[in-house]
């Protein structure tokens, strides 16, 4: 996608597992999905978006007008990982979201307010030789001046984040969406 400075873009990010992780899926199916792509990174991202006339040295402002949630969300944890692997052995937990009230029922007596934000928001990197890069491909795990996996709840509807353009076109990427 190519856009001009000031354009508004609607982005439908792809959920983890390419949208195949849904309520009712089991651990074996998750492992099959995750193993389907060789050398898969930890996050599913959407992009790049090329901004016409954006050049290294420019500053790119990304403003979030609105974040619209789907009807359900999943929490995926690698087997034996996470904060409490013994207490929560399930790899996938699904939650139905009340997008009108912007809340989720965590348990029968617990409602959690939803405040969605992108976990990954980034621009293209000029340095693709660092410790988080292999053969010119960089992991989304390590944040830096290009953005990346920042997991900042402050990046909500109405916020603007500024990134130094490092490559022609800026190359905007986003994904790993959360709803704190």
Predicted feature residues:
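Alpha/propeptide regions of enzymes that mature by internal proteolysis
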Residues: 1-10, 44-63, 92, 126, ...
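N-terminal, Lys/Arg-enriched amphipathic/low-complexity engagement segments
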Residues: 1-37
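DUTPase catalytic domain/fold
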Residues: 3-4, 9-11, 17, 57, ...
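Short, Lys/Arg- and Gly-enriched loop/turn segments at beta-strand edges
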Residues: 16-27, 67-77, 169-179
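Aromatic/His-enriched, Gly/Pro-containing loop or helix-boundary segments
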Residues: 30-52
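Short, glycine/acidic-rich beta->alpha junctions
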Residues: 41-46, 142-147, 180
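Intrinsically disordered, low-complexity linker/loop segments enriched in Gly/Pro
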Residues: 66-156
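Extended, low-polarity segments enriched in aliphatic/aromatic residues
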Residues: 152-156, 160-180
């Amino acid at each position: 996608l190519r856009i001009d400075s000031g354009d508004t873009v609607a982005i439908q990010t792809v959920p983890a597992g390419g949208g195949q992780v849904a309520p009712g899926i089991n651990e074996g199916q998750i492992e099959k999905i995750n193993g389907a792509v060789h050398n898969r990174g930890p996050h599913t991202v959407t992009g790049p978006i090329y901004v016409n006339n954006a050049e290294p040295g420019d500053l790119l402002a990304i403003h979030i007008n609105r974040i619209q949630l789907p009807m359900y969300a999943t929490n995926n944890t690698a087997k034996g990982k996470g904060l409490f692997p013994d207490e929560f052995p399930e790899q996938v937990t699904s939650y139905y979201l009340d997008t009108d009230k912007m809340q989720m029922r965590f348990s029968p007596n617990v409602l959690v307010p939803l405040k969605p934000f992108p976990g990954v928001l980034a621009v293209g990197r000029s340095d693709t030789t660092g410790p988080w890069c292999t053969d010119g491909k960089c992991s989304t795990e390590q944040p830096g001046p290009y953005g990346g996996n920042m997991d900042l709840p402050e990046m909500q509807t109405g916020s603007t984040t500024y990134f130094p353009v490092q490559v022609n076109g800026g190359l905007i990427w986003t994904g790993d969406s959360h709803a704190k």
